[in-house]
UniProtKB/Swiss-Prot annotation:
Keyword tags: FAD, Flavoprotein, Monooxygenase, NADP, Oxidoreductase
Residues forming coiled coils: none
Binding site for FAD: 18-23
Designated name of the protein: Flavin-containing monooxygenase FMO GS-OX-like 2
EC number from the UniProt entry: 1.8.-.-
Statement: the UniProt record of this protein carries the keyword NADP: yes
Binding locations of NADP(+): 217-222
Organism this protein belongs to: Arabidopsis thaliana (Mouse-ear cress)
UniProt GO BP: defense response to fungus
Annotated function: Catalyzes the conversion of methylthioalkyl glucosinolates of any chain length into methylsulfinylalkyl glucosinolates.
SUPFAM superfamilies referenced in this protein's UniProt entry, alphabetically: FAD/NAD(P)-binding domain
Family: Belongs to the FMO family.
GO molecular function, one term: N,N-dimethylaniline monooxygenase activity
Amino acid sequence: MATSHPDPTTSRHVAVIGAGAAGLVAARELRREGHSVVVLERGSQIGGVWAYTSQVEPDPLSLDPTRPVVHSSLYRSLRTNIPRECMGFTDFPFATRPHDGSRDPRRHPAHTEVLAYLRDFAKEFDIEEMVRFETEVVKAEQVAAEGEERGKWRVESRSSDGVVDEIYDAVVVCNGHYTEPRHALITGIDSWPGKQIHSHNYRVPDQFKDQVVIVIGSSASGVDICRDIAQVAKEVHVSSRSTSPDTYEKLTGYENLWLHSTIQIAREDGSVVFENGKTIYADTIMHCTGYKYYFPFLDTKGEVTVDDNRVGPLYKHVFPPALAPSLSFIGLPWQITPFPMFELQSKWVAAVLSGRVSLPSQDEMMEDTKAFYDKLEASGIPKRYTHLMPDDSQFEYDNWLADQCEYPRIEKWREQMFYIGFKRIYAQSSTYRDNWDDDHLIVEAYDDFVKFMSSYQELLPMLKT
């Protein structure tokens, strides 16, 4: 079965759902390709997850489906775990701004600097004029037009002006995946009397003063939050499934922070028993256990499902074969350098919608996707890691996207900087943000940046000394 494509250089009316980093660059690329774009954003500002709020949800575990949802999961102390040079969009560098004293010049800046960068990006490319703020998408579904095998998309949205139904040629989903928490499954937890919270609702450590806290998870948020809490807590115990069962060690530089293996059982007397045999009486368990992909507004009649955190079937993590090219997803992969990938995915989607780039047939896309899933299964990789891109896979994917669009491949300095930085996180988790040994790559980055912003020319002599 052949996949239907727009005529070459066709302009489409496109709804972009979300005005975070993915939605902003999707809007830019779609408009660059000649499409008419409306960005629907439920919040009052751009930035998505990077728009910090001190507000948290009333349900600390975010289990109640009727709860008022807070989109952002940022904690106040968060700094980027990726160097700013490799984090930015390819043609809009995320470089320091030496003449603006209000900005954070650090190489791993605070979340406020990332939001400021996204605002700069939106201003530079006049993106906000395409955004409808405080507009929540209630439903998006395909509707058949008379005489057409495949229809357009009806998007129902709600704002202070009421509910609106609109018809679009295509929908690009950019609503992020850091809002709907995943939780650890702990034997006996229903009878355990202590408090539980997911990191989605963590902002500051004050509430944990003098407590014994167990932090489940040792990825980015777990590493940061356990150290944040250790400043005020009596004890902090980190449970990590990536350690051996007998693990029990005090973390360097802390007198009240220990690393354990997984939890064996939680008991009604308030104790928690680890696989290493240690028993801890804890006040609070903090779940730093990641998030679920969640699209409550999207009705695809079963063509796209979320199964154990696999969104699929999706060709190259973007297009559902049965609904391509009118439905696409930007930003699903993780453990990546996100903004450049969002940009390349957006270029691909925009070019496919205009007809400048063609997709394989529906059958060929399904065959490719099934082969990818079969490869994961044969390697023993669980479904929940479908969109994880470890090792070289993210840059192979980025370069594949670039080739589709006849756009330059990812710079070698950017790849090397990511790899070195990623290794540094685990080798020196407490200090990696302020100690590094890849200055030569910083110089290469700024050599590239001057092609886009001549104001960085003055920084080069300082960087090279």
